[in-house]
């Protein structure tokens, strides 16, 4: 399952995914995220919450690349990834991030990630 939200007032894209993410769902996440990026101003932040991911299809990495290419074209500033106990998903996303030339800050809870992005820690 997933949820994608453009927080226009905070200039932030929030992507939450949890459970088993198959190829079709990964494509829907990509479509939803790419579809709302244009609602954000340049220098937006991206918060991805993976802490509830239990299984991740390889298509998720293809969609991560797609989302980040759209984010780069729009002009993102920072990425914070909430990993919780989803170590496998975190490692796979981190490898892809490095291949794309950016580093994501890691957080262990949504609250910690929001504090980081809001400038409080």
PLM segments and residue spans:
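Amphipathic, Lys/Arg-enriched alpha-helical "gate/interface" segment within cytosolic domains
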Residues: 1-121
């Amino acid at each position: 399952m997933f949820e994608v939200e453009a927080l226009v007032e905070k200039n932030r894209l929030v992507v939450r995914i949890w459970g088993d993410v198959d190829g079709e769902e990964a494509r829907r996440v990509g479509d939803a995220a790419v579809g709302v990026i244009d609602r954000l101003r340049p220098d937006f932040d991206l918060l991805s919450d993976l802490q509830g991911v239990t299984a991740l299809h390889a298509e998720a990495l293809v969609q991560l690349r797609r989302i980040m290419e759209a984010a780069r074209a729009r002009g993102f500033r920072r990425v914070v990834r909430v990993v919780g106990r989803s170590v496998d998903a975190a490692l796979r996303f981190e490898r892809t991030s490095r291949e794309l030339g950016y580093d994501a800050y890691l957080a262990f809870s949504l609250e910690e990630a929001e504090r980081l992005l809001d400038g409080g820690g």
